[in-house]
Amino acid sequence: MASSSFTSLSVMVLLCLAAAAVASAQLSPTFYSRSCPRALATIKAAVTAAVAQEARMGASLLRLHFHDCFVQGCDGSVLLNDTATFTGEQTANPNVGSIRGFGVVDNIKAQVEAVCPGVVSCADILAVAARDSVVALGGPSWRVLLGRRDSTTASLALANSDLPAPSLDLANLTAAFAKKRLSRTDLVALSGAHTIGLAQCKNFRAHIYNDTNVNAAFATLRRANCPAAAGNGDGNLAPLDTATPTAFDNAYYTNLLAQRGLLHSDQQLFNGGATDGLVRTYASTPRRFSRDFAAAMIRMGNISPLTGTQGQIRRACSRVN
């Protein structure tokens, strides 16, 4: 009986893996080449303009894609406002008060709808906008696989449980990424997104006041704008990369070598553990970082997409049709 149950479970697991592989296989970089040939150019122009107006927006759009893919897969669920039937993801602890860029996404969606209504999903817009944001700030490019569809619901609970917290140690970070079938290399490469953007005091306070693996001068610098008492200056911002905060480069890793990682989770990548070697490699070989980051972004973009007739193509990204 136990053997029969085990066999049935194995078959179910294989079927789930096969379904995931099929969904990813349905994505294609040329998905809109006939149905909306101007889609990618329209998105790129809007992203480039938004980042030129505010460099931080590049990091915000990249983060939106990451926070979308880690909850229910890359399905645009992070963009949904609360409704009478579900509470969205925007008020989850990792998102509340910090996730941003919705107005830019709405603007992009409106421009794309004007070109080809009802064709391009919000999930795909996030994926393309993330790539174009990185490029606009001097980072690598990659071919974005397309054909995702939009979810009709969101999950506050999954956003709270599945988005990696800045307080995680290396073991838990590795587990959080493994849950999404991302490797340790993916973890270290994708963390390099912290070469741009800002973080709130409440998310790095414990690191600069309590941790021992932090450069003393760096801790003093950050404490000037982040009081020790919780509730005091929680929303004060600091750059994740003090060296080149608006350039997408490999300075994040050189910062880690000097124990100048802003978040506890950042410095965990270079703290005497299994990822130290990869951090050193990325710090010394920017081309390797760019290559691995691009590959990891493609893999992350393949997390549980809705394809075919699943979900819908939202007319407005903040609500279901």
From Swiss-Prot:
Location within or outside the cell: Secreted
Residue positions binding substrate: 164
Cofactor comment text: Binds 1 heme b (iron(II)-protoporphyrin IX) group per subunit. Binds 2 calcium ions per subunit.
Q: Which GO terms describe its biological process?
A: hydrogen peroxide catabolic process; response to oxidative stress
Q: Which reaction does it catalyse?
A: 2 a phenolic donor + H2O2 = 2 a phenolic radical donor + 2 H2O
Keywords associated with the record: Calcium, Disulfide bond, Glycoprotein, Heme, Hydrogen peroxide, Iron, Metal-binding, Oxidoreductase, Peroxidase, Pyrrolidone carboxylic acid, Secreted, Signal
Record protein name field:
Peroxidase 70
